[in-house]
UniProtKB/Swiss-Prot annotation:
Named cofactor requirement(s): Mg(2+)
This protein's encoding gene: ppc
Protein name in the entry: Phosphoenolpyruvate carboxylase
A Gene Ontology molecular function term of the record: phosphoenolpyruvate carboxylase activity
Keywords from the UniProt entry: Carbon dioxide fixation, Lyase, Magnesium
Catalytic activity reported: oxaloacetate + phosphate = phosphoenolpyruvate + hydrogencarbonate
Active site residues of this protein: 138, 583
Family assignment from sequence similarity: Belongs to the PEPCase type 1 family.
Pfam family, one: PEPcase
Function according to Swiss-Prot or TrEMBL: Forms oxaloacetate, a four-carbon dicarboxylic acid source for the tricarboxylic acid cycle.
HAMAP family on file: PEPcase_type1 (MF_00595)
InterPro entries documented for this protein: PEP_COase, PEP_COase_bac/pln-type, PEP_COase_Lys_AS, PEPCASE_His_AS, Pyrv/PenolPyrv_kinase-like_dom
One of the GO BP terms on file: carbon fixation
E.C. designation(s): 4.1.1.31
Length: 920
């Protein structure tokens, strides 16, 4: 049965109704705030924007006072936010409706498993596949947590819109409640007054687990097993989705990540998942009133019941309730042990008096914490078996099944935490250790070969460590060793899986990896036979990606490395950086270099008998590797996905994908389906054509790289253009993350972090990282020989990688606006700097023409009508914000705004990012 499209014409009509209603309410609230006369300014601005009369729009905006700017910029920031909510609600509704009512509907996962069931290795693939979304704290989420909480309420209310229309609930009361929340959001500070701290980022991301991810991952895993069973495949304990996290462990460029934040990240995770179990056990306690006078439990349930401290006379004949009470008591002790704080919600959630917890039995039979999730699961399994023995299998479904599945997936923490640090920091620490131990006085001056010889020798000097209490350590070394010590303690306490990887940013050599091994050895996480934390190189720049094959070949040749990998099921993970490679060489060079690197690294792994797995460091925007997840995965090189893939999810993308459990389920389903399809299917129509396609790409990408670097690195005015004709300075002062905008003082483009680079190009609507250099490179190839355009058209139709590459450019171009970009260019002080815009404009027009020619389309987004419709509905609103932002930046730079007014610029940044939906 074919997969039905989620976007229907009826759905678009509902969205239009909702948007009209939301707009009406927002208008009424704003009128009341500023009066009818002032609101006419907003109305005139809207008319001019819809007519695209940008000259007149600029004049009107220039005459708005600073005081009026506050409400007007707020209005145009809130409106696209409300449109986003409406679209998200209707996507969730359609997913839920088709899953629950349409018997002909088969989601992508169902189709994928159905197709796989007939293959000889189908069961093995389904048992082994593991997709790991890794949530990061990259600063691209501009919304305050308070705003997100209010939007959640509006989301829930809009879910009831159809019921309100149908009279199932009171339409008038529904409208009143919706109006209340829109009024609250309109009168709430959009911008954070202070920069986020790491502890805030940890707390913020936990709301997605509490609100959607635990349920979505658990439900999806259960459905995964059921679908396989439906086709005759009994899976043991598959983990198609597990979660990862950087927050609290990613200290690359962030001095605020410490041993304390790493510990906090793990502790808060334990608290959240244990509270989830406690709540589920509370629900089971309330409902499992089975009487032993009617149903006799097995001996193990009777044993659990006998250990319960619930001494209520009313529970004497209810062994299941008392068994659940005992299990819950042990969870309480487990939470105290793992988090050093009691389960405060426990007794009240169960509905018992506090005396039940302090009965005399507690002194004679102290409740012990669970040693591991395995012990917890064993108690639940005992109850399950008793129910099966009595023919009560129906009672297993629901909360009991959910909590058992959750234990298998999560255990006592939610996500494996990655550690990450820059290679230069590790080199400095190792140099200090070697000097302090009188081994090498100036380690950094050694050649690469000499460095590796020294490091491997020290790694083989077991169990000797280099640090000594007698030798003073720098603050940097103390901090790094403290983090690794905490990592070891957390692994001992919560299990090996809690911290599995350490990523090395800017990996440029084999010694970078051995330097990390030295640091890990200092705290007992590495020895000759085993690495308890896998060393993961991150290749980021074009040059490093080109060198990755040789670096990994040399690394995998060492005997000690072979021992480490052998204890990790023969896997070696490699992280690929999409952001820096794009900033370094442009969109085409980045995409193609990453594609080739995966092929080469996979081959090197096969030569050494090692399974190479890839961790894709993608952002939200195309310029940082973003785009539709399904297409991104299925366009990877065939053979590059063995059975495991990891990918980053960050900033505004986390909210978009995981803010609602139905949408979260849908996105996770897409990730699994795409990964399985890429594992088993050679997507290209004719595999024999791939060599000729590669030759064509090599030629085009070489030209693209030259064109890109000529402007970005060779044009003496480009640096000033970026800093003067974009809001980069204002973006850098926005409180959207704990991490600084640059690793050091910015004096050149290479020193700027990728996120503010991409974020700023999104704000001025050029979207530069997602397309620059594409048009000229393709045009040169097309002009080289007759028939070359037809060859590119054939590649677009038959090669998923190439199709995805161009579709992303198509999407980025549709969000750009050169009329607005021209106005930003006028912010530059000199004509030479302003003239950079015309180079960009020429390339933009050429890129658009070439992309449409290769696609054989008349207009952008012909293949994506839903996005086209969505952009059409929201563009007039956030186009206005660009003109307001330009005017405010002029005033700010001319000292016509005071410090309190800077937040007006930040409001526009927020609104534009909201309208674009993926901005960093």
């Amino acid at each position: 049965m074919p997969l039905k499209k989620l976007e229907s014409s009826n759905n678009q009509a509902i969205i239009a109704e909702e948007v009209a209603l939301l707009k009406e309410m927002l208008e009424n609230i704003t009128r009341r705030m500023i009066g009818d006369d002032a609101f006419t300014v907003i109305e005139s601005i809207m008319v001019l924007s819809e007519k695209q009369d940008y000259i007149e729009l600029e004049k009107v905006v220039a005459n708005i006072s600073n005081q009026e700017m506050e409400v007007i910029s707020r209005y145009f920031s809130i409106l696209p936010l409300l449109i986003n909510i409406s679209e998200d609600v209707d996507l969730a509704y359609e997913i839920n409706y088709q899953n629950n009512t349409d018997t002909d509907y088969l989601g992508k996962l169902a189709l994928t498993i159905k197709d796989l069931a007939g293959k000889d290795n189908g069961k093995d693939i389904l048992e082994q596949v593991n997709v790991v979304p890794v949530l990061t704290a990259h600063p691209t989420q501009v919304q305050r947590k308070t705003i997100l909480e209010l939007t959640t309420h509006i989301h829930k209310l809009l879910r009831k819109y159809r019921d309100a229309k149908a009279g199932v609930i009171s339409l008038e009361k529904w409208r009143q409640e919706l109006y209340r929340y829109i009024e609250m959001i309109m009168q709430t500070d959009i911008i954070r007054e202070k920069k986020l701290q790491v502890k805030n980022e940890i707390k913020n991301v936990m709301q997605y687990y509490d609100g959607s991810l635990i349920q979505a991952v658990t439900k999806l895993t259960t459905e995964y097993k059921n679908l396989a069973q439906k086709h005759g495949l009994e899976l043991d304990n598959p983990k198609p989705i597990t979660m990862g996290m950087w927050i609290g462990g990613d200290r690359d460029g962030n001095p605020f990540v410490t041993a304390e934040t790493l510990c906090l990240s793990a502790t808060v995770q334990s608290e959240v998942i244990l509270n989830y179990y406690i709540d589920k056990l509370a629900a089971l306690y309330r409902t499992f009133s089975l009487s032993s006078t009617l149903v006799q439990p097995n001996s193990e349930v009777e044993r659990l019941a006998s250990l319960s401290q619930d001494q209520s006379i009313y529970r004497g004949n209810e062994p299941y309730r008392r068994a659940f009470h005992y299990i819950q008591s042990r969870l309480k002790q487990t939470q105290i042990q793992l988090t050093n704080q009691p389960a405060a919600r426990m007794s009240s959630s169960v509905g018992l008096s506090t005396s039940a917890w302090s009965s005399p039995a507690s002194l004679e039979n102290p409740i012990l914490a669970y040693d591991s999730p395995v012990d917890f699961k064993a108690d639940l399994k005992a109850i399950e078996q008793s129910l099966l023995d009595n023919g009560n299998s129906a009672l297993i479904e629901g909360d009991l099944r959910e909590v058992m599945q959750a234990v298998d997936i999560f255990g006592f923490f939610l996500a494996s935490i990655d550690m990450r640090q820059d290679s230069s920091v590790q080199e400095a620490c190792v140099a200090e250790l070697l000097k302090g131990a009188n081994i090498v006085d100036d380690y950094s001056s050694l050649s690469e070969t000499e460095k590796c010889d020294v490091l491997v020798q020290q790694l083989m000097e077991e169990p000797r460590t280099l640090s000594s209490a007698a030798v003073a350590k720098s603050d940097l070394l103390e901090k790094e060793l403290a983090i690794y010590t905490t990592a070891r303690e957390l692994k001992d306490k919560l299990g090996e899986e809690v911290i599995k990887q350490h990523i090395i940013s800017h990996t440029e050599s084999v010694s970078d990896m051995f330097e990390l091994a030295i640091m890990l050895k200092e705290v007992g996480l590495v020895d000759q036979q085993r690495a308890r934390v896998q060393i993961v190189p991150l290749f980021e720049t074009i040059e490093d990606l080109d060198n990755a094959r040789d670096i990994m070949a040399a690394y995998l040749s060492h005997d000690i490395v072979k021992s480490w990998i052998a204890t990790n099921r023969n896997y070696q993970e490699i992280m690929l950086g999409y952001s820096d490679s794009n900033k370094d060489g442009g969109y085409l060079a980045s995409g193609w270099t990453l594609y080739k690197a995966q092929n080469e690294l996979t081959a090197i792994g096969e030569e050494h008998g090692v399974k190479i797995t890839f961790f894709h460091g993608r952002g939200g925007t195309v310029g940082r590797g973003g785009g539709p997840s399904y297409d991104a995965i299925t366009s990877q090189p065939f053979g590059s996905i063995k059975d495991r893939i990891r990918l980053t999810e960050q900033g505004e993308i986390i909210e978009n994908k995981y803010g609602n459990k139905d949408v979260a389920y849908y996105h996770l389903e897409m990730l699994i389906s795409a990964s399985i399809n890429r594992m088993v299917t050679q997507m290209i129509t004719d595999p024999n054509e791939i060599d000729s396609f590669r030759e064509i790409m090599d030629s085009i990408v070489a030209d693209s790289n030259i064109i890109y670097r000529k402007l970005v690195f060779d044009n003496p005015h480009f640096y000033d253009y970026f800093f003067e004709a974009s809001p980069i300075k204002e973006v850098s002062s926005l409180n959207i993350g704990s991490r600084p905008a640059a690793r050091k003082t910015i004096t050149e483009i290479t020193g700027l972090r990728a996120i503010p680079w991409v974020f700023s190009w999104s704000q001025n609507r050029i979207m530069f990282p997602g397309w620059y250099g594409v048009g000229s490179a393709f045009k040169r190839y097309i002009d080289r020989a007759q028939g070359n355009l037809e060859r590119l058209q054939h590649m677009y139709q038959t090669w998923p990688f190439f199709h995805s590459l161009l579709s992303n450019v198509d999407m980025v171009l549709s969000k750009s606006n050169m009329n607005i970009a021209f106005q930003y260019a006028q912010l530059a002080e000199s004509q030479d700097v302003r003239d950079v815009f015309y180079e960009i404009l020429d390339e933009w027009q050429l890129t658009k023409n070439v992309i449409l020619a290769i696609q054989d389309h008349d207009d952008l987004l012909e293949d994506n009508p839903s996005l086209k419709h969505s952009l059409k509905s929201r563009l007039p609103y956030f186009n206005v914000l660009n003109y307001i932002q330009i005017e405010l930046i002029k005033r700010w730079r001319n000292n016509q705004l005071d410090e309190n007014d800077e937040k007006l610029i930040h409001t526009t940044i927020n609104g534009i990012a909201t309208g674009l939906r993926n901005s960093g």
